[in-house]
């Protein structure tokens, strides 16, 4: 592929349920990352980008506040969910409420778009 892109993808709330959102549901106040169900339709879209030759890096903020190393769990989930990727980065990601950047996509907008042209 001549126009290979490096694409960073978040995990929670992007390719699987968000643990913090799950905790808002009655009876799920103690939900953990293990309880998050994958969004297979979204995973397939990113897998297609990988198959097209793009480099896919999954980067998660899991453990940023708690200091817990979620690398093993997260890699196991990616394997079980058949997520194709070049690299996994766990931690080291800043926590923020909003990210403004000329190269970012909102997950909902990206996955629900009729056309997904890459820049």
Question: Which stretches of residues belong to each language-model region?
Answer:
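Catalytic phosphate/metal-binding cores of nucleic-acid and nucleotide-processing enzymes, i.e., regions
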Residues: 1-119
